[in-house]
Design a protein with these regions (language model features):
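Short, basic/aromatic beta-hairpin or loop at an interaction surface
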Residues: 41-51, 115-125
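Boundary regions of SH3-family modules and the immediately adjacent low-complexity/disordered segments
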Residues: 27-40, 57, 61, 73, ...
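Short aromatic-glycine-enriched beta-strand elements
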Residues: 80-85, 152-156
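Generic beta-strand structural signal
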Residues: 45, 77-79, 119-120, 149-150
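N-terminal Sec-pathway targeting helices
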Residues: 2-18
Length: 178
């Protein structure tokens, strides 16, 4: 359980460091008289559809939708690092804000028919809202899950994401017992 808390702290520290790095790069560029626009490619990593919003708040107007695996261009982060501004979208506005936790720096491998995997751990394992996101539920050792996509060390399962190292893939043709 302490390891999960440490992971949450590390993910928050990383988000702050990303924002700090962006600010530092802008300051350095400004002092040299040249400010290059910031751009970063990220990939949508979510179970289903991701809302694109008008501003970096959960209650903000929805202006479009993205799907798992979509490539986005990030050009700004919210002050708290929880949201990213994306451009070049196939939506009416062509831009908007999405939650950072539903993005990945690595390409997302979409799986045609999600393979089954069993949770292998000494205790329960956190299923998170996104990569290194907040815990949304626990799952127990022996639970069989369908893996929808993979990105780096993370596996997307129905209802969230979890570290792939806790999963052992079942042989093709296997299915969960009732």
């Amino acid at each position: 359980m302490q390891a999960m808390r440490k992971l949450e702290i590390v993910s928050k520290v990383l988000a702050v460091l990303v924002v700090a790095e962006m600010a530092l790069m802008l300051l350095i560029g400004a002092s040299l008289g040249e400010v290059e626009p910031f751009q970063e490619t990220r990939y949508v990593f979510c179970d289903g559809v991701l809302n694109v919003r008008m501003s970096p708040r959960g209650g903000s107007e929805i202006t479009g939708y993205l799907f798992c695996g979509d490539e986005v261009t990030v050009d700004d982060y919210s002050k708290d690092g929880a949201w990213v501004h994306v451009t070049g979208l196939p939506t009416e506005y062509g831009e908007g804000w999405i939650a950072y936790r539903y993005t990945s720096a690595e390409e997302v491998e979409l799986l045609e028919e999600g393979p089954l995997a069993v949770v292998e751990a000494n205790g329960r394992v956190a299923v998170r809202a996104g990569i290194a996101g907040e815990r949304v539920r626990w799952t127990s050792p022996g639970t069989v899950l369908t893996v929808l996509a993979r990105s780096g060390e993370w596996a997307l399962v129905r209802g969230g994401a979890m570290m792939e190292s806790y999963l052992s893939y079942l042989e093709e043709g296997s299915h969960a017992e009732a």
